[in-house]
Amino acid sequence: AWLDQQRASGVEVPTVWSGMEISALLKGCLVHVLALGFELNHPALQPYNRGDAVVGEPLRAEAVVRAIHDAGGLAVLAHPARYRLGHDMLIEEAAWLGFDGGEAWYDYEMQSTWSASPLICEVIDRQLSNLGLLRTCGTDTHGIDLCGR
């Protein structure tokens, strides 16, 4: 509301997107899906926004992607090289299921000062690009310890 008021009064403000990280099963592997730019309070996302974990069908990646799309958002595979299955396999499956993109640039070493992991990020970026998917960058910084991240 505050940003809208500032914008209405002629103040230049940044564009802020809604965002949420949702756990999902992709090829039997628990992954994180970033929901970006969705309609806040959309009923399709309520099961994922209650504070408790979903089970069964709502946990499947295709259900998560469908809910995000129903809410007008983009579904992005977060940090694809952090999981027990290979990033190439997960990205292929994500593309097949209708994901909109993947997190290409990420600090896999979790350094004290954020820096993308060049070799793996370049491979992921190229694969996402070849599949026509959006490519994002993320810090994966949760909480108040943001210094350097």
Report residues per predicted region:
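Active-site metal-binding loops of divalent metal-dependent hydrolases
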Residues: 21-22, 80, 106, 139-141
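Extended substrate/RNA-proximal surfaces in nucleic-acid metabolism proteins
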Residues: 2-98
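Structural recognition of alpha->loop->beta junctions
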Residues: 91-110, 149
